[in-house]
Regions:
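Phosphate-binding site recognition
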Residues: 1-223
């Protein structure tokens, strides 16, 4: 399985004698996570909607992992940047149109309204929705979490949507999905937490990509 996952700076790469000028990036030691994402997707597409959460610090490979697991299936990918909600929704409407080849009307005012529209589509077709950096709604509009709970409870049993939610702020993602007082508590079918690679795996990666690495170079990716 190949994907852009382990990222080096161009400056540091130039210090190492690479085996090839074109670097092929691959997954290391993530087979179980890919298998679980595929398993949940299969249940969503054949039975009813499922929600899976993927957490882990930034640059640990959440997005690459998700894209690898879902490749070849229709996926509406929504990245929650710290922008005004109206700007995000305008961008997301275009993404939904292009990905699913469906009509999505102009002027949808909120993320909640867009999600409801997509859930209605999910009554007649199966597809993935990936919401990346979901915790950013704390800074944009925290009511989204309650809205998502209501939509999920209303539509889960009658739709075939594989909802993948990821976030890089572990403490906030834990709060959103595991705190008894939060509206989305108990809604996720599974929560995957990506950890940093063990030293043995890191050594394999460095040997594959830059065999002349030093112990100091290795330490850069164990912090």
């Amino acid at each position: 399985m190949f994907s852009i996952y382990f990222v080096f700076s161009q400056q540091r790469l130039s210090q190492w004698p690479l085996r090839k000028q074109i670097i092929i990036m691959k997954f290391y030691n993530r087979e179980k996570e890919v298998a679980e994402l595929k398993r949940v997707q299969e249940l969503a597409f054949t039975q009813n909607s499922r929600m899976i959460v993927v957490t882990g610090r930034r640059r640990i490979g959440k997005t690459s992992l998700i894209k690898e697991a879902l490749k070849g299936t229709p996926t509406v990918y929504l990245f929650i940047g710290r922008k005004a909600e109206s700007i995000l929704v305008t961008d997301f409407v275009k993404i939904a149109r292009e990905t699913l080849s469906i009509f999505v009307p102009e002027g949808i005012p909120t993320f909640t309204n867009l999600m409801q529209y997509l859930f209605e589509v999910g009554k007649t077709r199966a597809f993935n929705i990936v919401i990346d950096e979901f915790q950013e709604f704390y800074n944009i509009r925290p009511d989204v979490f309650s809205d998502m709970q209501n939509l999920w409870d209303e539509y889960k049993q009658e739709t075939k949507i594989n909802l993948v939610i990821s976030g890089s702020v572990y403490s906030l993602m834990q709060k959103i999905f595991t705190d008894h007082n939060e509206p989305l508590f108990g809604r996720a079918d599974n929560i995957l937490c990506l950890r940093a690679f063990k030293i043995g795996v890191l050594k394999q990666i460095m040997e594959d990509l830059a065999s002349g690495y030093s112990n100091d170079d290795l330490l850069l990716y164990t912090r």
